[in-house]
Amino acid sequence: EAQKAGYSDELFGYNQNAQYLMSFAGSFGCTRYEDLERLGDTVKLKDYFLKFDALSVRDHNSKSIVECLTGKKSAYHLDPVFHFDYSEYMPKLSHNRAYLAVYAYSGLSEEYKEVIKKYAMKHNLEILCFMGYQDGLGKFMNISPFELLSYMKDADRVITTTFHGSVFSLKYNKKFCAIVQHRTGIGYGNDEKLGDLLKRVDLMNQMIDRPELVEKTLDSEIDYTSVNTYINECVKDGIDYLNENIKCLK
């Protein structure tokens, strides 16, 4: 089941012989409280979370789960990617042609692929695919994490199906569209984290669920002045949280 993917008790503080236990911008992903009830994990996770000295999450779904489990409110922070400047680690690219970056899980529908191809052709953009291979769509880039950041920063446009694809787009002030996958039943969805992030920066219009919205969304202007102001305030809040809790170790 998708809700069990990547699960490890150690991620929730189990068997950690630490003086102080804290989380920073953690997330349950698409897992909801009712999933934990169905899987029989609520009692165990409640016990784990009550042992934390400080709890921080990155989305309201996770915040709600922690509160349902423990009765306690957690801090609410942006993804850690926003909190660090990676510039000195990012290589300079020798890629000369303007490109459309597709940062997505494998298996984009043929309808989305066709729309993306037409958009790229209309704007004379090369299509470069990152993260997941897209059969018949552009060039797949098998690169290092810091090379990826350089490519995201230099992209003309970004299309993504992921939370972190949207994070990179915001961090580097890109014109982008985020394809949302609404969860059905106990299957996978990306709207818990993705929708929460875009709502926070008032960019819900960049989230689409139909191929015909790609062109309009990629061409829409984004006021990054207000977005960056909000992100900078949240980053400061996150750093203050970290500093305050690190002091407790002294």
Q: What does each of the following model-derived ranges do?
A:
Residues E1-K250:
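Active-site anion-handling motifs in enzyme catalytic cores
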